[in-house]
Amino acid sequence: MTYAGFWRRFGAYFVDFLALTPLIAITIYGTNLTRWFQALWLIPGALIGIWFSVHLVVRYGGTPGKLAMGTRIVMDDGSPITRKAAFVRYSVLFGLSMLTSAALAYSALQIPEDHYMSLGFVQKSMLMTAAAPPWYKGVNLAMNVWVWSEFITILFNKRKKALHDYLAGTVVIRKAA
């Protein structure tokens, strides 16, 4: 197996970000439309995340970014990734994302509707962050540390494994030509 290196994996992450850009647009639009959007988007957002990061990985061996960069995710022994392993790979980011989303939904609902609607998107975001429960900052910090640690870990091991690969017993390899 030829392991996918840092830049190929970073490129896949960037392609996935681009693929999810329409969802970012929906979030911006919805956030500007009503303060209820954050709460209403929790379940659909979670389901889309699971579909993208678990279902597509099991079905095709990777996310669109991984596939576009000529890589695939397999078990450590080279066999196809299992559903359980795909979920374990995504579980930490999923949990942290759900907690931050729930905190922002809670804070949005604490803001009076007329005040919320009088603000621009950036002002709404800043106000929701300021009004979030006290644990939000710790969870948000943990999520940032997790994401950066993923990339740093790839740099310092021969198999180019990220933390989630160690948890799930997976590795990202280059597809055979």
What are these regions (language model features)?
Residues M1-A177:
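Membrane-interfacial and juxtamembrane segments of integral membrane proteins
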